Curated annotation (Swiss-Prot):
Native organism: Escherichia coli (strain K12)
Family the entry assigns: Belongs to the anaerobic coproporphyrinogen-III oxidase family. HemW subfamily.
PROSITE patterns, sorted: RADICAL_SAM
Localisation per UniProt entry: Cytoplasm
SUPFAM superfamilies: Radical SAM enzymes
Record InterPro entries: Aldolase_TIM, Coproporphyrinogen-III_oxidase, Elp3/MiaA/NifB-like_rSAM, HemN_C, HemW-like, rSAM
Protein name: Heme chaperone HemW
Amino acid sequence: MVKLPPLSLYIHIPWCVQKCPYCDFNSHALKGEVPHDDYVQHLLNDLDNDVAYAQGREVKTIFIGGGTPSLLSGPAMQTLLDGVRARLPLAADAEITMEANPGTVEADRFVDYQRAGVNRISIGVQSFSEEKLKRLGRIHGPQEAKRAAKLASGLGLRSFNLDLMHGLPDQSLEEALGDLRQAIELNPPHLSWYQLTIEPNTLFGSRPPVLPDDDALWDIFEQGHQLLTAAGYQQYETSAYAKPGYQCQHNLNYWRFGDYIGIGCGAHGKVTFPDGRILRTTKTRHPRGFMQGRYLESQRDVEATDKPFEFFMNRFRLLEAAPRVEFIAYTGLCEDVIRPQLDEAIAQGYLTECADYWQITEHGKLFLNSLLELFLAE
């Protein structure tokens, strides 16, 4: 018998006003109106099929991602979250996050979302530079980003996050730090600060822009990290910074190899069973197929040989120590199966080990891919 990990719920809203050239998420440019009521009903039907996966557990966190969830109307959000509460037991202090694009933010709608149960908003700012926002294909300007942050702050939500990117096309060190300073000035409890990466199957993938070189990227990261630390933010994951007590609980559950039910277009799920079986689910990507009632695209059991890599893949993105008991409890494997890999990781200086946990080192963070490759199945 394995210990069932904490459970989260991910809900995907697939539409955007327009597709950004760097984005490889499952998002679809909107043609006409959002089918609010129909899509919400399909989401709840999809959840009905998966509700047994909860296995009596409370849902600790909900994350509504996209696409652009802030295109959903207030009443539709109310129906959606009421429907979730009717089907699943929510923890009394459940964190309920939704993503918002500053270009789609309306004060009344934010209030409606809060009334529906949303207590944390993640705002996709990306940059405060008009020129950089245009290059990124964003539909908002710097002032709209600041207005959205101030609106979120004024609602008295449990928390809000600003998403910010660095390493943008032709971005100088001073421009990157300028973005960070403006974000810090808005005093978000949480900041996600991540490097732009060029993904295949995107506009940038087919026509790559000129990005800062590795030396410039390192300077941006190093000085940006110092700026955030001085402002009271603690880094707890590769790209995540928070004031004390404001870490994103939903993402922490992903990174700690927790379980999550995924509903909506292209949503992924991971479910553990008492016998140690781990099931991964993927939902139909395209809204057309999904809204014809074809919700499940595929599902597969995680092979025992793949479990160590899957456990460590996200665990080692976190700066906190990884408890050794969790590896055994959440994978159903004993440590003996990875002892040679652990010894190699320790010998390479990637990890330290004590009686209770493994801790990734500074060297391990720099060579994270090399560390993870040790745990890949032969």
